[in-house]
Amino acid sequence: VAALAGTALSGEAGEKLLALGLAKLEQALPVTVQPDGGHAKRCPRSALELLFDLRALDEALVQRGQGAPESLLRAIDRLSGAVRFFTLADGALPELQGGEAGTKAYVAAAGAAESGSPPPASRNGYQRLDGRSLQVFVDAAPPASGAWSINACAQPLAVELLADGRRLIAASAWSPEAAGPQALRLVDASSTLSIADAACGEPLRGFRAATLGPRLVGAYETVEVRRQEAEGALLVELSHDGWVRRFGMKHERRLYLDIAADELRGEDALVPVDPQGQGEEGRRFIPFKIRFQVHPDVSASLARDGKSVLLRAAEDDHGWWLRNDAQSADIETSVYFQDGKARRAQQVVLRGQARAESGARVRWKLTSAAPGKG
């Protein structure tokens, strides 16, 4: 698209090339830009970059005195709505599905927020929950497939959390520009539940990757979402089938944002699909972990009870408690990418063990550590 914008500014010499390029663009846009404005890659950063390119092309056509195709204007309008939905409380983007957050100034330069209308609750397979101090963003759809999946991540039901306009729980922020391994596209590099050392989708390797690119294969195909809204509360219930074949378990995640109490209550469960079956692994006891990737500007420390975790940014007066009823809780080293460069970070790891016939359930809660709360 950027090259097409340059062609539009080249005068008569580029007219034939421009006409051909615009015709191909009109064919590609309905496939690339979904009806709700999301990019086919399901990457928020990809939607932003395409919006920049299409705006540049539109401006170049204006300078030529040529009207933009209706499909281009429609794509700009849809992408603007999606980027407005993706813009979080700190002015940057979610770091999911192969894209970094960007800066507040960079995201604002796209002009997507100019309408002033409130963002919708869901777009492009994501759910957004906005409270007084807390903001929750959750990946609620399967990753892209085929050629669109070169940057996709197999991280079902991953969440990002902001508190008081600051990032608290994040993703690893892996992107194609990151100097990090492809393994960071897997489930245990995100804020969600994983089983043993298994993956529910992974990138191609070796000859196939050299031929087709590091496409994601073997990923989960079904994510179910149910959302309920009431005065002072938001509830999103999700599940995915990524563990069914191997372990006979469905992962269910429940997120309840209590706006009045200014707290988030979460629940992660492994539920047997068939109590008589154990999946291909044939395990009776299934170890699992629930990870919360902590943003590098936030410190995590265990309380005396050995389970509760205090999450606190340097400029935060009080911090936030992450309480849970897991079998154990630990703080481990992790990595976070910013502008493609690795930063040392922490992750909270909740451990448990599910029985093949009955599953398991872990409850957790994020609440303010300010005096009189929590």
Residue ranges with predicted function:
Residues 323-374:
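Beta-strand-rich recognition/accessory modules
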Residues 108-299:
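Catalytic and substrate-binding regions of extracellular carbohydrate-active enzymes
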Residues 127-129, 234-240, 302-314, 322, ...:
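Generic recognition of long tandem-repeat/solenoid scaffolds
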Residues 279-334:
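Polysaccharide-binding surfaces and accessory modules of carbohydrate-active proteins
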Residues 34-174, 345:
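Carbohydrate-active enzyme catalytic cores, enriched for enzymes
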Residues 1-45, 49:
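Active-site lining segments of carbohydrate-active enzymes
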Residues 12-13, 63-64, 275:
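Secondary-structure transition/capping motifs at alpha-helix termini
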Residues 239-244, 269-274, 312-318, 325-327, ...:
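Secondary-structure transition/turn motif
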